Amino acid sequence: MTNKISRVSKDQWLAKGLEALEAGGIEAVKVERIAKVLGISRSGFYWHFKNRQELFDHLLNYWTREYTGIVTDNPDLMKLGPKKRLLASMEMIRDKHLGKFDLAMTLWAKTDSKIRKIVNAVVKMRLDYLRATFAELGFKGDELEMRARLFVCYHAWEDTVFPDLTDQQHSKLQKLRYQYLIQN
């Protein structure tokens, strides 16, 4: 009986690449290391990427799409009114741990101006989405900007700064934070 290893998808490579980035920075994102974690030979890498630099480029796109675009470009969220959209966004960010790799990306951005531009563009996507939502709620100027930035900062760093929150604590704090953000 032979154990045939199924082909590993591009997204599986990228997901493991993000985990490697989180665990050890950009120097830890090595083809051989990721292949070993996936339980395959490194030759499988070349089905999806020409080289390590191409992996990095796709890694940035994957992070943007799967950890920001999933909220900001979500047609189901956009159908909701602004209050429900804000709450649903909070829940999605927490449930899917969408801020999980933000620290790793921020640290990588400090070492490379190209990466910094992409990370800044992702932050802008998040802020623009939230600015539009808070504007729909009637906020303007500094009140709008403070809410958008507070939301982005808290949700991007919650898993890093408060990793031991229980579900009950998180739920209680999320309700309070939501009420705080929508009150005039």
What function would you assign to each model-found segment?
Residues 1-8:
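N-terminal intrinsically disordered/low-complexity leader segments
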Residues 12, 16, 20-54, 58:
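Helix-turn-helix
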Residues 16-24, 66, 70-74, 105, ...:
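Solvent-exposed, amphipathic alpha-helical segments
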Residues 21, 56-63, 70, 118-119:
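Alpha-helical DNA-contacting segments of helix-turn-helix folds
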Residues 58, 72-99, 147-151:
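Hydrophobic alpha-helical connector segments
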Residues 68, 95-104, 113-138, 146-149:
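Amphipathic alpha-helical packing segments from all-alpha helical-bundle domains
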Residues 116-120, 135-184:
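Hydrophobic/aromatic-rich alpha-helical bundle segments in the mid-to-C-terminal region
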